[in-house]
Amino acid sequence: MKQVSSGRLRSAKAEDGAQLLRLWALLFDEAGPTSDEPWKGHAREWFARYVDDARNARFPVIDLGGPLVATAIGTLEVGVPNPQCVRGRTVRLANVITLPEHRGQGHGTMLVLDVVAWARSIAADRVDLSATPAGQRIYERLGFTVTSAPRMKLVL
């Protein structure tokens, strides 16, 4: 892996919202954002609500001095304490994305490590994520393990 050169990891600011939305859209459409789908309005509102809430959300970005090239999201989920999550505090790592032309430079690793450090700083018990096949190897290298319980969902 190449070293990150001239990239600066920083926290997203409110004015980064449009750029983050563009990056998040790439997760769902590798060809790039094409329309103002309904989720985008909700995502804008959600980001505006949580961008400055360091107790419940973390938005690291890689800034090379132009448009943002990479980002990730960490959000705190509080549930019932249990033997595997003694305080009931889980950070959900999501939307880890680097622009294709900037991949392989360590940006994603920096973002994940930043969210993990934030999770420790807020006394979370663990960090959970859903990995793509391409990303699984990277997460395993950073200490994440595959769980025995499959993720499931019910779309409402």
Where are the regions a protein language model picked out?
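Conserved GNAT acetyl-CoA-binding A-motif
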Residues: 112, 119-131
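Conserved GNAT-fold acetyl-CoA-binding loop/helix
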Residues: 28-47
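A short beta-loop-alpha structural element at the N-terminal edge
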Residues: 8-22
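Conserved catalytic-core motifs of GNAT/GCN5-like acyltransferases
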Residues: 79-82, 128-130, 140, 145-156
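A short helix-loop-beta-strand connector motif used in the catalytic cores of GNAT acetyltransferases and
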Residues: 48-60, 92
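Conserved acetyl-CoA pyrophosphate-binding loop and the N-cap/start of the following alpha-helix
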Residues: 102-114
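A conserved beta-strand-loop-helix scaffold within acyl/acetyltransferase catalytic domains
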Residues: 72-82, 86
